[in-house]
Amino acid sequence: MTKMLAVGLMSGTSLDGIDAALIETDGAGHIRPIAFRSDPYAAQAREQLREAAALALSFDAPRPSPKIAAAEAMLTDRHVAAVRQLLAAARVEAGQVDVIGFHGQTIAHRPDRGWTWQIGDGAAMARALGIRVVNDLRSADVAAGGQGAPLLPVYHRALTAGMEGPVAVLNLGGVANITWLGAGEGELIAFDTGPANGLIDDWMLQETGSPYDAHGAFAARGTVDRAVLGAMLDNDWFDAPPPKSLDRADFTIQPARGLSAADGAATLTAFTAETVALALRHLPAPPRRLIVAGGGRHNPTLMKMIATATKITPEPIEALGWNGDATEAEGFAYMAVRSLKGQAISFPGTTGVAEPLTGGVTHRP
């Protein structure tokens, strides 16, 4: 199959920054990572995106908004700059790049209402860089009755090819999702498991002014409040079978209010771990290995709690020889290539769509 140079861009619901990756891939089994960079958002940009998301969630459906348009313009400019810096560091000319997979920023995800909203101007990016851009990768799936998430399973399948199954890949971003890959061809199940870093980050920002709990140190000093944890886990969403997906705002830190800063961090961290354990009940068989990607793998307190809750030792994705910080961005580069080739990026077992479906909108310079 034809190999392409592809850039992938990811800005997650944790609002920590932009991940940009350059890979060579055929959209199937060939993947060669070339370069990666991560650019953190300044506090002002983070707040602008947070306000845009809060506004979007108040709408019944996506509609024009000056505040959201301004956030989109800022976001697009930042992503264009990230691509230029990535290519300069890799000594790759724009003309050598076949496509950019531009996820954009999710500001509202409402598949139950038939829509999902990722801001990011793909046409403006294509003009600015002179490179084809594929964006809006989730909307086609939602329009076809799918959840629109998670999308990374198609990339997880490629990364774990050749491993003895079943294997699970757990992505700990703002929201957590799990991909289960069985021993047989086509055995692919994926769904959101619950909040991951999102609630912990919100708590830390409110209680300490820090955007996250570095190395889980704050949670490690606290004590889990079992009553609060039990109340948070008493939610029918965790019993619902997959496919299912979440908006980052579907759960809040409200139940932890009144706890000390450390105890709240410990309780919310335990909540993430316990929801991962609950998710394993929905899998056809326990995974032999639990591979962990996303920022949450840098939190040793969370990783220990996941091990205790699941009785499986979680392994950072680096155990496979991959850069766990780059996985999501690489995945969207991979999906952009598949989109150009008309190949599926979502499946009945991952989003609930009726049949394997491609996605994305292509913008030419």
Curated annotation (Swiss-Prot):
NCBIfam families: PRK09585.1-5. ATP binds at residues 12-19. GO terms for biological process: 1,6-anhydro-N-acetyl-beta-muramic acid catabolic process; amino sugar metabolic process; peptidoglycan turnover. Belongs to the anhydro-N-acetylmuramic acid kinase family. This is Anhydro-N-acetylmuramic acid kinase. The lineage of its organism: Bacteria, Pseudomonadati, Pseudomonadota, Alphaproteobacteria, Sphingomonadales. It catalyses: 1,6-anhydro-N-acetyl-beta-muramate + ATP + H2O = N-acetyl-D-muramate 6-phosphate + ADP + H(+). HAMAP family: AnhMurNAc_kinase. Keywords: ATP-binding, Carbohydrate metabolism, Kinase, Nucleotide-binding, Transferase. GO terms for molecular function: ATP binding; kinase activity; phosphotransferase activity, alcohol group as acceptor. Pathway: Amino-sugar metabolism; 1,6-anhydro-N-acetylmuramate degradation; Cell wall biogenesis; peptidoglycan recycling. It comes from the Bacteria. Catalyzes the specific phosphorylation of 1,6-anhydro-N-acetylmuramic acid (anhMurNAc) with the simultaneous cleavage of the 1,6-anhydro ring, generating MurNAc-6-P. Is required for the utilization of anhMurNAc either imported from the medium or derived from its own cell wall murein, and thus plays a role in cell wall recycling. Its EC number is 2.7.1.170. PANTHER family: ANHYDRO-N-ACETYLMURAMIC ACID KINASE.
